[in-house]
Amino acid sequence: MKKAHLTVQSNSEIADRIYKMVLKGELVRHLTEPGQFLHLKVSDAVTPLLRRPLSIADVNFAADEVSVIYRADGEGTRLLAGKKEGGRIDVLGPLGNGFPVRRIEPGKTALLVGGGVGVPPLQELSKRLTEKGVNVIHVLGFQSAKDVFYEQECRAYGDTYVATADGTYGEKGFVTDVIREKQLEFDVLLSCGPTPMLKALKQQYGHKEVYLSMEERMGCGIGACFACVCRTGESDTSYVKVCLDGPVFKAEEVAL
């Protein structure tokens, strides 16, 4: 983990309340594992006190640039949405453990499933997998057409299916409906998104090799505050820290 000030290259709305921010700085050279995250200080003022954890969406090592995607819902992310080109942001990272790209052999097929703001980390993951010869299929889930983003970016690396809960774009239903109806075949499943989606994927495909990136509220981002603990399922008193031990876990390692 390193601490640095990165420069805002751009910051724009790409879907309903969904923003893409591109940051530049030497810290980017250390972002080698898809699925890790950055911890951004959103203001120089006393409040908001806590940093905001944002997953790494795309890395351009040649330009020392990293893209992060976030939904401007709360006070902190609304402050981020107001950041202008040329501004500086205090960043900690990379944090956490990412997806196991090295374990997936060339020629295998990986199914990447994202829901809402869980879609961004799949972009860099897809890029890294295809670079090593892994076949990639994407299934992206959103609430409505206005929420859809990153479809074309995913299509650049492999077949991509989009589902919306209200049926206003792509297939109507949930990501699990698409996987079943399209009869998608895969060797390994990697997913990031809301807990109900991850739970459904674990229930239906837990007999296969499945990796889940957990979305939990975080305080410190380094495992000190215990705000993001998740039960392991071994017992009612056995927990892991999502920020430190995760955010990516094998499906059987966590209770959902």
From Swiss-Prot:
Record pathway: Pyrimidine metabolism; UMP biosynthesis via de novo pathway; orotate from (S)-dihydroorotate (NAD(+) route): step 1/1
One annotated GO molecular function: flavin adenine dinucleotide binding
Disulfide-bond pairs as recorded: none
GO aspect biological process, one term: 'de novo' UMP biosynthetic process
Binding-site residues, [2Fe-2S] cluster: 220, 225, 228, 243
Keywords of this entry: 2Fe-2S, Electron transport, FAD, Flavoprotein, Iron, Iron-sulfur, Metal-binding, Pyrimidine biosynthesis, Transport
Purpose: Responsible for channeling the electrons from the oxidation of dihydroorotate from the FMN redox center in the PyrD type B subunit to the ultimate electron acceptor NAD(+).
Binding partners and assembly: Heterotetramer of 2 PyrK and 2 PyrD type B subunits.
Record's protein name: Dihydroorotate dehydrogenase B (NAD(+)), electron transfer subunit
Organism of provenance: Bacillus velezensis (strain DSM 23117 / BGSC 10A6 / LMG 26770 / FZB42) (Bacillus amyloliquefaciens subsp. plantarum)
